[in-house]
């Protein structure tokens, strides 16, 4: 990818690889030193990733593309304004390398199209969700990070194949 996708996913300097590496580095450095005579206090961090494609009005799970479960945006409760996507799969990962492998596998199913300026312009938005749950003997802390790669900004008229009603026209008339 080029442009926005390269900025988000570039192998060594993309925002997503940098964010995942920084996250796991921080989680690893949070482990307190344990005196030899003491047993370490149970402390764990669970990290999971989800990857959603938004194409027009359609939501697709890029980590479980063959799933028949329809994805829908839902509100958590009447008193909570939090939105979530029901049916979206989530995969637990142990380190940044594993997370990036999962993300790259999912992105292979992302819709792309050749344009005059870019051989593989994304035609959909991709939303990476990273859930972190850190537990020690006194508390559980949950955090969530969203990283979004927007669809290519080329207008449909710049596409080599711009059939009427193509998904690219939904975003880029």
State where each predicted segment sits:
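P-loop NTPase motor catalytic core
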Residues: 1-173
